[in-house]
């Protein structure tokens, strides 16, 4: 059990956050026709939305940002739909099912990055940028080098996420639907390409909104039924769970998963700053009309996500009571059928029968599609807008840029399917950890300092950004997950699971040192431009609004 918990501690914090990567052994379940029918209804409905959206996508603004006409409330729901993953739902509830109170600490830990986005990033990002966060980073710095660095940071994060998503999708669908792994991966890839290729940000937004509503409804119903079972008393919920759990009262004790304080701090920093550097999340702030709506987006999104993670805590304890103590959900060896990640799915059956089980299974699949669609659009915009239109072919027409974007969507989709098949039996949890570390070590420092530090120069941003990215990759390779578990060495060169504490420090120090020592005329000019940028970031004066965006 201790080894299982250690593995969960190493993989779930990141996998649950956004990757849908269901780690560990998966037992294929019998074909669930109710779930398949419900999922097909969702697919047909969302493809109808994609067709509707395709008729309204007439320009680059429409494709990248839905014309800037998404409201703060809608965008908040879409952000929540982009961020709340199937592994958040299944993984966190499984963590609570096995470890109790520690699951709450992890689930709430995913929210710590959102106050940073709310207070430091959202408004200025919207006022300074148009389509990608590279627009903000390059506002007063050299366009070419900064956009190349930002695009590389975005593409690496997107690529790592997509691989983890595709592998997680295949495993999850095998687990829930009883479908073949390869069929599942191809299905997700094709649907992902159709949503983004034809509907752009408008279709992606509505897929994410629908998914968020379905997931919040399903989780709310499960939590309500659990609380009804215990007379709406948390005291009864915890008492009954402690009475049937093998650990007894120990499930209410915190600190059982990450005992090393440096690892805990590094994990926390990675989650906090990584969230604020995810390209597919940052891109959503350009879909609203102004900074006020951007701020409202974060407010609503944080509320929806906070509510959802509290529900997963109730669901996890409900699973201890109604699933863990019921031999009907266990195999001959006494283990949960399908593994611990099936705890929430079994609970759906326990509280709502086969029909609700089919609904929850379909919702879990829908969450994957919503997340991969956002990732694909973020990757495509990094190539077409940042690299093609602003570096390699300046002055490209909107039509040319959109063509490159759609070609990139196809390429990303095919690559995601191929790598999803190739990585079927690999430990992909480290990819998500690495993606988070890169987002925190490369993207976040550049975004933050470009908006707030007047002495930042292109030299400092380039040196610090690349140092942060390379440090995160190297330390992850030398750490226990890759060096020992994957490459088979006896002892890790870098002793900690999570590199964020060190790679973020290297990035900020590098940016500070190389900017402070930059005495060039170009550096002086970039410092002088900060005042104009600051006024624009505060007022939004000069930024295109609404449909013009």
UniProtKB/Swiss-Prot annotation:
Q: Which UniProt keywords apply?
A: Cell inner membrane, Cell membrane, Ion transport, Membrane, Sodium, Sodium transport, Symport, Transmembrane, Transmembrane helix, Transport
Name the GO terms of the biological process aspect.
plasma membrane acetate transport; sodium ion transport
Q: Which domain of life is it from?
A: Bacteria
Q: How does it sit in the membrane?
A: Multi-pass membrane protein
Give TM segment ranges. Answer: 33-53, 77-97, 103-123, 148-168, 183-203, 206-226, 262-282, 303-323, 355-375, 404-424, 428-448, 464-484, 493-513
The family assignment reads:
Belongs to the sodium:solute symporter (SSF) (TC 2.A.21) family.
Q: Which NCBIfam families match?
A: PRK09395.1, PRK12488.1, sss, symport_actP
Q: Which HAMAP family match?
A: Acet_symport_ActP (MF_01426)
Q: What is this protein called?
A: Cation/acetate symporter ActP
